[in-house]
Regions:
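Structural signal for interior beta-strand "rungs" in well-ordered beta-sheet cores
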Residues: 141-166
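Terminal amphipathic alpha-helical/low-complexity segments used for targeting or macromolecular assembly
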Residues: 1-139
Length: 166
């Protein structure tokens, strides 16, 4: 049964994700290193997202570290992206019966990953870095199987379930 965090005045999404991840690392030692690298060593949700997306979308021709820095820049310059990320995580938690923790979409749901990668691609596109946005759109399509034009605009609170055939 899901906890009703959203109606609590002291709810902190980042702290909840860290607590869930700490519990998962303790419960499943085989994933402890992955969970530490991906979530627990970071000090913010933005840093986790930038790291996780750059790890997934980096390639031999797109350095993971350079991509991480680009993602960090987008998230720090345009705080609306971070607000949308949080709204999307909350929407998935509320609407998806298979999601009983906020950390699950962040770690494992390719639909969530595709939407967040698109948000940053859109920022790049809007800020004159269209060639990079197109490159990352293509990379996102290769990795997640989701193809979204970088000029497309989304609202917040999105849930792209499974993202197969989208």
């Amino acid at each position: 049964m899901k906890k009703d965090h959203l109606n609590s005045t002291d709810f902190n999404l980042w702290h909840t994700i860290r607590e869930e991840t700490e519990a998962a690392a303790a419960a499943e030692p085989m994933l402890a290193s992955f969970l530490h690298q991906t979530v627990l060593r970071h000090d913010s949700l933005d840093s986790v997202l930038a790291y996780h997306l750059s790890s997934k979308l980096g390639s031999p021709i797109m350095d993971v570290r350079a991509l991480f820095e680009i993602y960090q820049q987008a998230l720090s310059v345009d705080t609306r992206i971070s607000k949308c990320v949080e709204a999307d995580l909350k929407a998935i938690y509320e609407r998806d019966p298979a999601c009983d923790e906020y950390s699950l979409p962040l770690l494992y749901f390719k639909g969530f990953h595709a939407v967040q990668a698109h948000r940053i691609n859109h920022w790049l596109y809007q800020n004159g870095r269209k060639t990079l946005a197109y490159f990352l759109q293509n990379r996102m399509s290769e990795v997640f199987g989701v193809d979204i034009h970088p000029a497309a605009r989304f609202g917040h609170g999105l849930m792209l379930d499974h993202a197969t055939g989208f």
